[in-house]
Amino acid sequence: MNGNVYLSPTVVQWLLPETVVAAAATLILVLAAFLRGRAAWWWLAGASLAVSALLLAGQTPQAQNLGPVAADSLAIYFRYTTLALGALFLMIFARSVNPAQSGEIVAMLLYMISGTMLVAGSDELVLLFLGLELVSIPTYVLLYLGRHDVASQESAAKYFFLSILSSAVLLYGFSFLYGISGSTQLTTIAETLRARAADQSSWHILGGLALVMIFAGLGFRIAAVPFHFYAPDVYQGTTNGNAALMAVIPKVVGFAALIRVTTLAMPTLETYGWRLALILALLTMTVGNVLALWQDNLRRLFAYSSIANAGYMLIGIAAAFAVNLQTGTPGALNGVDAAVFYLVIYSLATIGTFAVFTWLGSRERPVEHVSDLEGVGRTHPISGIMLAVFMFSLAGIPPLAGFWGKFEVFFAALGVREAQDASVAGLGNWFVFLVIVGALNAAIAAAYYLRLIGVAYFKPARASLKGEGGLAAFTAGVVAAVLTVVIGLAPGPLLNKADAVLTPLDAGQNIPSAEVPAGDQVVQAQP
């Protein structure tokens, strides 16, 4: 692709929200070298998110993609989600980090937010990979800055090397896609694969290899089994704030990329796709939930919780592949919208949980073990209520938001049996089995989530927790708890937004790109 296409006025205007956040990060990083320990960095970061949200509010889904940019409902949904979650993270980190490092930490947070937004709106492999690296590189820095003991440095190094490996595997998968289609633009790749669907040449094998490598590369980011093994050690070796960040942002960016590159750009490879996603969902749910039962370290427990919840989201991806997005049938749309709806619900509950942990502890005495929560429901009643809300939601107990999240992904899987295509409907038994395993996993998960509530309310109180994590972290917990309850009682608005993320335009139709200035057109090789 000619680099000048990124400078066309329409592309620049569409990318302004991401640009504002990245520019603020760069400004803070430069100034922090001369002005140390300034609280102003947090306010400047918050202001950049607010300005970005205002710019985003002026954007609407376009009838055409803008060159390398996907100007669709899915991009807008993910970008709003990222900004909202980013604001909560700023509140959690505000008092829990070393003031001398606040400039660097704020800047890294903003770069991660900008990168996630960039991936969500990418219609081009190079731009998408750039966004992924804009998330990964700041993550290395944050893990290094979080703590300075041996365990922390070991976990940071482990994540660094494995992340590099996953990026290499992902790029290898992208190279196969380029070789098959002759283009790096996702809509062109989808059109090429659709045009060659009846061709029984070796491209199907190459496409299958590309799909496996892309799932492997992105599976690392979403912590799907068997690419999950770094997560428990990395979460345990870092701070509560960093653990929350690791549990949420890589999943948001990972699923945004997975939806873009697989279910939207490679819908004709559903023969491989639904099987691969279904197997990953089964393994990820089961391994995550079973291993979480034996954990005493809270960050390690929520690492396995994060793994298990990635499995539930993969149910939606599997359903989308099974129905095949190019047909535009409701089941396919339900698969993707169920996944993105569940992603928001999971993110709120996880961020809220770590906000409570941050509030209850301090930099010197963080909340780390299950026993640290003993009696919290009596010594810190509001924190106990918030913790109960988040645990009930993660367990999928009505009427909280988590119930609707699980309901949506299970409903999407069962919807495969109702597909108009008889060959697709015949796959329904596999998805019934998937839902049964998912329900059993939900029961297993309830055991360790409800265990935390039992410890908080039915164990003798500990006097060691003073609630010194800062008002901002407490406020983040309250906001997340209120949203979890409100969405649970009235899920309609968020469900409608999730339902709208894939219009017929996005769902595999012939999507032209908006015109860009002469000489700036996408350069495509002949397949």
Where are these regions (language model features)?
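Alpha-helical transmembrane segments of multi-pass membrane proteins predominantly involved
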Residues: 1-527
